[in-house]
Amino acid sequence: MGKVVGIDLGTTNSCVAVMEGGKPTVIANAEGFRTTPSVVGYAKNGDRLVGQIAKRQAVMNPGNTFYSVKRFIGRKFDEITNEATEVAYSVVKDGNGNVKLDCPAQGKQFAPEEISAQVLRKLVDDASKYLGETVTQAVITVPAYFNDSQRQATKDAGKIAGIEVLRIINEPTAASLAYGLDKKDNETILVFDLGGGTFDVSILEVGEGVFEVLATSGDTHLGGDDFDKKIVDFLAGEFQKAEGIDLRKDKQALQRLTEAAEKAKIELSGVSQTEINLPFITATQDGPKHLDTTLSRAKFEEICSDLIDRCGIPVENAIRDAKIDKSALDEIVLVGGSTRIPAVQEVVKKILGKDPNQGVNPDEVVAVGAAIQGGVLSGEVKDILLLDVSPLSLGVETLGGVMTKIIPRNTTIPTKKSETFSTAVDGQSNVEIHVLQGEREMANDNKSLGTFRLDGIPPAPRGVPQIEVTFDIDANGILNVTAKDRGTGKEQSISITGASTLPDTEVDRMVKEAESNAAADKERREKIDRKNQADSLVYQAEKQITELGDKVPAADKIKAEGLIKDLKEAVAQEDDAKIQTVMPELQQVLYSIGSNMYQQAGAEAGVGAPGAGPEAGTSSGGGDDVIDAEFSEPEK
């Protein structure tokens, strides 16, 4: 089994790690950074850009640069109406109600899974270069509060990227693995994970290699992006009051505002106020307009007060579900870049009555934990037992539109549970099973994971047939449902239809497209490399001919200059076929010139040339040929 990497696929940034010599190592990307922006851009010339290079060009190319895509993955369009308006690119609904991201540069629409797959592909490629071997297997983390659809969609993204996803693991659980790997004493810890787009709280018992999740809670609509949005709205509102222009309606201005807001938020974690300067943010008939203001930490905390208050709700819920007292918590572990916000740290301290532990790197700890789990699955790490839970209740819709729970939230996984149901009317020959996930009493208020039918039930009075419905959650937290007529033994077993927004045929198409794109990308890279080599060869040829001057035979010089001219034209016209033809010809001429020069030098040296015969030079061996010489020491 090859190396299994651990990947934290984040909303804002992603990170990859691996076990080396029994210790987890975070792998730097090709640009030298330990985290990679979860950003994918498509340039007008068709080039696909991923990571830092994509983020850098976002202001100039907002409509084709995709970020915060994790907030859309595995969701229907009706679930993301607010988030869809907060990004500079176009988020649209397809004919099935699924989310699509419009890309004018490519003339097509992407599923969120396709964009996430590009980020995963870069992380795995960078890991492969670091390890010196091809990486094909990974453990990928997801927010603990991700539902079944979002988990399946994340797994699909891995498949599109050409990765075998061995395990989907919850982010707070991964963080606890990294925190507690070397801990011998038993501890009860609370992991407070506030990332770029999601928020999770998990309470675990950790010690002697056992990591047991007692309870988890969260909010998949709360993260650093929301804090950025508050700053954007504040700045845009103030500008609109002064100038009468809403900057949020201009995609380029919105992108600049978003980047400035993120920068200001980060700076306010260390200083009490920060300057925000955006020259030429827009223009009117009167000329260009500039945004120049100061934002204080106090004002930032004021405009984000509702978000900070929301951080407390999942904490209280998790403590209640774990059935423990706050005083029983030994450590509070902060995870995610947004936990650097002082007001967030203060609310944690206020609710739990103790200072949080800041001994882990909030940007890397989740990937480190995923790498440890990868080590467990590959057999490299021994004596670790991970007991995670299902974050939300699972059940079916029953008579009257009620949700009947089969697996309550915070049930340890993997798990399998069954309930027996019957028909609602006389002579009913089939039943429709509507699978739900959530905590509300009525079916319509919960997340619909899909429906399926069990046919062929023999006619009987209502209440007589016995239909056994079995829910089976695997270690990834992904659900399979089976319905069986106990009278006839007929069975219908499915992986939830609708659990993923992408059908298998669509995923397979995207996998093939990604593979063909990978080949095209490789070919494009090879062309660029050849062009660069040709540039370098032209420079070397011109330099060599100039330096050698008259030593170059006239015929060779004329031939070389002609080939240099041809190669320059091929490079300027990006004629790859011509480059491949001319470059070896020029190299051969240069070899010939170099060879002739050395032969000429040897001929001019005559008998004194090295190796010119037995009488050439002086012998260093013993015998009469030794020449004794006396040297006078210079006067000092």
UniProtKB/Swiss-Prot annotation:
CDD domains, sorted: ASKHA_NBD_HSP70_DnaK-like
Xref: SUPFAM superfamilies: Actin-like ATPase domain, Heat shock protein 70kD (HSP70), C-terminal subdomain, Heat shock protein 70kD (HSP70), peptide-binding domain
UniProt modified residues of type Phosphothreonine: 198
Compositional bias annotation for Acidic residues: 625-636
Transmembrane regions: none
Alphabetical list of PROSITE patterns matching this protein: HSP70_1, HSP70_2, HSP70_3
Region of interest (Disordered), residue spans: 604-636
Induction statement: By stress conditions; heat shock, ultraviolet and oxidative stress. Induced by hyperosmotic stress (0.5 M sorbitol) under control of hik34 and rre1. Induced by salt stress (0.5 M NaCl) under control of hik34 and rre1.
One Pfam family here: HSP70
Domain of life: Bacteria
Regions of compositional bias (Low complexity) in chain numbering: 604-618
UniProt family annotation: Belongs to the heat shock protein 70 family.
HAMAP family to which the protein is assigned, alphabetical: DnaK
Entry-linked NCBIfam families: PRK00290.1, PRK05183.1, prok_dnaK
Protein name according to UniProt: Chaperone protein DnaK2
Name of the gene encoding the protein in the UniProt record: dnaK2
